[in-house]
Amino acid sequence: MDEIATLRRRIDELDLALVTLLNERARCALAIGHEKELAGVPVYQPAREDDVLANVRRANRGPLDDAAITRLFERVIDEARRLERQAAARRPGDGAAAGTVESA
């Protein structure tokens, strides 16, 4: 039982580190979203999303398979995109970049 408790504590530590990193990533995404809005660029950038997913799959050494890594990062990217849209909607201006129709 001591080993289980030790491993669970380690998971708790890793979870806290993940939360910190995810929030740091979200702050970067928000800053990028602001720059996109200033440049009149749409929130959704499919080529960039493809690059991000390819990068994390290349970095993956398991035990999670590439499909699992892809699903996790697709969710992270979706949340970043949602934050970008929310932030753009709160800023004064026409919000043209935030309202751009997305295409896959």
State what each model feature region is.
Residues M1-A104:
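Domain-level signature for soluble enzymes in the chorismate/prephenate branch of the shikimate pathway
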